[in-house]
Amino acid sequence: MANSSVYADVIVVGAGPVGLFVACELALHDVSVIVLERDADSDNVWKKGLLGGRGMYKPALEAFYRRGLLADLLYDEKRVTYLEKTSGFQYAGHFGGRLLNANAVDFSRFKYHLPGPTFLPAKTTIADIECELSKRATECGVRIVRGVEISRVEDEGDEVTVWADNQSFKSNWLVACDGGKSTIRKAAGFQFTGTDSELTCYIAVCDVDKPELLGKGMKPTDAGMYIVSGPRHLYVMDFDTTFDRSQTVTKEHLERVLQRVSGTSVKIEALELVSTFTDRCKQTTQYRKGRILLAGDSAHIHSPLGAQGLTTGIADAFNLGWKLASTVKGYASADLLDTYQRERQPEGAWTLDWSRSQVVIMRPDPAGKAISRLVTEYMATDDGTTFFVNKIWGISRRYDLVGAQAHPLVGCSVPDFQFEDGSYLGSKLHEGKFMTVDFSGSKLLEEATDLVQPWVGYLSCSVKDRLGMNALLLRPDGVVAWVAEDEVKVDSWKAALSQWIVLPGEA
């Protein structure tokens, strides 16, 4: 017999980076949260060091930065805020193993991409992210329950019940962040569609007899690609999907694959760790079904080519957290939660297409090689490099905000304006509120903002370059919802705000 139910406003399933970020966002807004995690221990070799290494691009960096977590996560209080170009090569990313030179990027094309702590990508590990987010979640009162296996979930219309081991948990909402094989997604009947794999990929910690034959870095070949990322760390991507991934990868099998893909006679002398993955690309057709929502790999899976997975998942969490909190607290506009799917599903679909297109240029057939030559030629130009780096880094990502003001900055992440004292706007957004940013010195917006406290903050400041703007309204995730370039009109500001929350007297 099950024990009496444990209740929270929201249940989050999965204590990885996405689930923990959602939990922290909810708790920031005084929403009670329980996180249920299958693994009893967060310590895992695949989350640490080179094996756990992940790239983070602008959307994810901004999420951590705007909640005061970036410096601790990167162990870097004085992060480089701009790219100093050199005469040689500076790595900016890759597309299907074809490298991009940051020195060829024309950053002048990105008016709103200002120097600051999120200007450049960064590297971290899953272990470090989980450590920092777990600390923040605990400080905010989130309860994390580890070592529980979910057996059933039921959306009962006005609440959700989750059964895990000999315990039931009830909440008003459930957010599934439990990975690509999501138990919740399957149990709740979400459709998950897309394309099957063309590649079988191996990641290994091993010793080889002649490492000089392999070299270092990314190596596209006529049979796929391999990557030597460290003295003993190896990735091999093979256009052969006949291997049964439920079987153990032996040293002999991996050696045969490595020799075929690399075109060398290198031998594996010792195999310490090995795992496999594929390039399957699938996405749920709905991000919300009743009171159950999906985020991160629960909503979309793809190969790790281009290192977009972590950024896409954290961006899901950042977009969803404040919207769900507003809904729980009762001040959300009627369709606020619908905007989560409206904004994030296209981003997930783009990530899948970005992954698929890289596989295409890696194909060993004549068509794949022809496309590869064409893409590589374009990437070698300044225009091509600028295009690819913009896409990979997420510099000019923009949400199409229905009914919003027609301005090129509306729907974009707010520029990281630098104040006269040297600080940046991103460091002023830690409370996760809507924010009126006023460069005009007018009292009108301050008085209007006072009427909608505590949901909206007000910041009057002098910045080094206001980019022709007098005032802005920011969502809690830092997305621009309204801009005043000339006269500041309070009615226009109020109309923009009312698209997201119910203003006092309008309920």
UniProtKB/Swiss-Prot annotation:
Transmembrane segments: none
Family, as annotated: Belongs to the PheA/TfdB FAD monooxygenase family.
GO MF annotation terms: FAD binding; oxidoreductase activity, acting on paired donors, with incorporation or reduction of molecular oxygen, NAD(P)H as one donor, and incorporation of one atom of oxygen
Role this protein plays: Monoogygenase; part of the ergochrome gene cluster responsible for the typical purple-black color of the ergot sclerotia. The ergochrome gene cluster produces several ergot pigments including the yellow ergochrome secalonic acid and its derivatives, as well as the red anthraquinones endocrocin and clavorubin. The pathway begins with the synthesis of atrochrysone thioester by the polyketide synthase (PKS) CPUR_05437. The atrochrysone carboxyl ACP thioesterase CPUR_05436 then breaks the thioester bond and releases the atrochrysone carboxylic acid from CPUR_05437.
The keyword Oxidoreductase appears for this protein: yes
Cofactor(s), by name: FAD
Keyword presence, Zinc: no
Induction: Expression correlates with the formation of the sclerotia and thus the pigment production.
EC number: 1.1.1.-
Protein's UniProt name: Monoogygenase CPUR_05431
Enzyme class: oxidoreductase
Pathway: Pigment biosynthesis
Swiss-Prot/TrEMBL keywords: FAD, Flavoprotein, Monooxygenase, NADP, Oxidoreductase
Gene3D superfamilies: 3.30.70.2450, 3.40.30.120, FAD/NAD(P)-binding domain
Species the sequence originates in: Claviceps purpurea (strain 20.1) (Ergot fungus)
A Pfam entry, by short name: Rng_hyd_C
Phylogenetic classification of the source organism: Eukaryota, Fungi, Dikarya, Ascomycota, Pezizomycotina
